[in-house]
Amino acid sequence: MTSGLWREICERVENPGDFAAFEMRRQDMFMGRWIKHSSFYPCWFVRLYRPDCVRWERLANEVAIVAGKTGRLSGHFLHYPFSKGTAAWFKRHIQYAEFESRELLSSRAEKIDWRSLVAGEPQERRRQLKRLFYRMPARPLIKFFVLYFLRRGFLDGRAGYNYARMQAIYEFMIQLRIMEDSRKARGEPV
C-alpha cells in the first residue's frame, strides 16, 4: 500500500466519523508496472469497514453490502494478482469461472433492470451490466476489444496487451463452463 493510503487509514481508524466503511482504489500491477488502462481502474473496493456493518455477496469477486454510510479514501492500494505467476492466476480463474457459471445459470431467467443499469448504485449497475454482458455472443472478443482499444490498454505496453488477452481467455473459460454445466443439467455428455 502507498504511504499516503497508510496515513489515511490510520486517521480513519482513529476517527471514522459516521462512516460504516471506506472504499479505496486499487492499482493492479503486472510485469513490473501499473496496468492503468487495461485494468478496470478506477474501480472502488470496500477494504476498511466495521465488521458489524458489512456483509459479503458472491463467491468470486465478492461484493460488500454496507449497512450505513460509505466514504472514500484518496490513496491507492497496490494489488499484485500475478505475484505467484500466471499459472496460479489461471488456476484461480478456472475456479472463478466455475462460480460465475453457477451464479449466471441460477439468475439467467431474471430480467435486466434497465433503470439500475443506467442510474443505479454502482454495485447494482455492475450486476446488471454482467447480466447484459453474459447474454452477448463473442464475449471474449468484446472483452479484449474493450480493454485493449476502448480503455486504451495499448498504452500499458506489452503488459496491457497480455492482460487484455488473459481477461479474454477468462471470459472464454466462463463460456465453456456455462456450456458444460448446461449440458450436465440436461443430462447430455460434456
Name what the model sees in each region.
Residues 186:
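Membrane-interface aromatic/basic loop that binds lipid-linked glycans or pyrophosphate carriers
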Residues 1-182:
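Catalytic-site signature of metal-activated, phosphate-bearing donor transferases
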